[in-house]
Amino acid sequence: MPPTNNYRISGEPPSTTPSHPPPKPKTRILSLFLVGVIMFSIFFLFLVLIGIASVLILPLLLSSLHRHHRRRRRNRRQESSDGLSSRFVKKLPQFKFSEPSTYTRYESDCVVCFDGFRQGQWCRNLPGCGHVFHRKCVDTWLLKASTCPICRARVRLWEEDPQEGELWRCFGHRRSSLLDL
């Protein structure tokens, strides 16, 4: 084996002092730096996820809130104006009470004023439920509440079968089944 030349490129003989190993990297500084980078990455990812969630959930939350307010407004409006209009009440069927009446077999007294029916008094027969009242009594009642004082059925001017009534309305006709008096 040929002799090895221990001279460096500079041409100087190698030093006789032992060479130092390369310096160790500062692991403490490196680990602190990596921990900082990882924490920043996790925080940034958390912010991105919060942003995505808010973009997806916020519209749902706002629409739900809008529906809730609209429902409350509608309920408040119904509570404040639960009575019928005077125009509507005037269209309800009326008749003059006569003693041999078909209505006397159902009620002998008006349940609004607790007074009996007398000959010649104007009365109303509510369509739908068929209950009979003094005209003045039931008119006052219906201006405040849109239901029958006895059975609480909603007062409607026209009796309709819900499906059949829709069919007649489609053809532009109003099918009346008012009671013949």
UniProtKB/Swiss-Prot annotation:
GO terms for cellular component: membrane. GO terms for biological process: cellular response to hypoxia; protein ubiquitination. Keywords: Membrane, Metal-binding, Transferase, Transmembrane, Transmembrane helix, Ubl conjugation pathway, Zinc, Zinc-finger. It comes from the Eukaryota. Residues 1-24 are annotated as: Disordered. It is found in: Membrane. This is RING-H2 finger protein ATL56. It comes from Arabidopsis thaliana (Mouse-ear cress). The gene is ATL56.
